[in-house]
Regions:
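Alpha-helical transmembrane signal-anchor/signal-peptide segments
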Residues: 15-37
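Short, small-residue-biased leader/transition segments that mark boundaries at the very start
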Residues: 2-3
Length: 173
């Protein structure tokens, strides 16, 4: 009985990984593969994402950094992206773009921004805490009018979000 559950979990996890959007994993897999090697993490929204190039720091100063910033990140998303990253890495320095500090909302209207920030991380206590915090407002909706509260499980189990993506799969999936 336990083996059947483990097998089912493994199959669901494998299918989820196959059909998920790849943006989050493409951005974060190099970080996850070498998380212990980074001295500096950069976090924030599009300003940080497009304005900081860790490879230049490496080439000029020998400082290893990784840019976790992403388009549409609010300060709460950035905070939880950092907390999730700290489950994997212990950088000496974190550089935080706080341009969005005056925004009064936790989530932007684009739910794909949240997926980009969190899909790459395995289910963990930190990821669950992040989603509980970010998706606690029943009035917060995405651009399609869907309440984030109703989408929380899609961020933990991406198969719920991407199950219909079969027709879009390519050889690179």
């Amino acid at each position: 009985d336990v083996y059947k559950r483990q097998l089912l979990f493994g199959v669901v996890a494998g299918i989820s990984r196959l059909v998920e959007r790849k943006e989050s994993r493409q951005k974060m897999q190099p970080f996850l593969d070498r998380a212990g090697e980074y001295d500096v993490l950069f976090l924030g929204d599009s300003i940080m994402n497009t304005g900081v190039f860790p490879m230049e720091m490496w080439e000029k100063y020998g400082i290893a950094g990784y840019n976790i910033a992403s388009y549409g990140n609010t300060l709460p998303i950035t905070y939880w992206a950092l907390q999730n990253a700290l489950d994997y890495a212990k950088p000496k320095l974190v550089v935080l773009d706080v341009q969005g500090v005056s925004k009064s909302y936790k989530l932007s209207g684009n739910s794909s921004d949240v997926h980009t920030a969190f899909d790459c991380y395995s289910i963990s206590k930190t990821k669950i805490e992040a989603l509980d915090d970010l998706m606690d407002d029943p009035n917060a909706v995405d651009d399609d009018g869907v309440a984030y509260v109703d989408m929380k499980w899609e961020y933990l189990f991406t198969l719920g979000k991407y199950h219909a993506r079969w027709s879009e799969l390519t050889d690179t999936d």
